[in-house]
Amino acid sequence: MICKLSDKKNNEKVVLINIKGGYGVYQRLLDMGLVPGVTLEISHNHGFGPITISLKGTKMMLGRGLAEKLIVKEENNSEKN
């Protein structure tokens, strides 16, 4: 199912498929390693405030507005990184 990162729950693994936003947002996320095709795990998402994710063993916090610009899909066994 395709949705925004902010819609996912704790401990879910997802694959980033698109970034909605202007060049500045896109470049900032690319610099953080958030590129289409990368697998993320949601560490903390309580429905408000920032979201904590794990990316290749590194935890990072994203503001909710930024997380709403990330379009993700559920990870399948065949897509694990």
Regions found by a protein language model. Name each.
Residues 2, 24-28:
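Short alpha-helix capping/helix-loop boundary micro-motifs
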Residues 5, 29-33:
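Short, surface-exposed secondary-structure edge patches
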Residues 51-81:
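C-terminal structural segments of small proteins and small subunits
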Residues 1-7, 56, 62:
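Ubiquitin-like/PB1-type beta-grasp interaction modules and other compact soluble beta-rich domains
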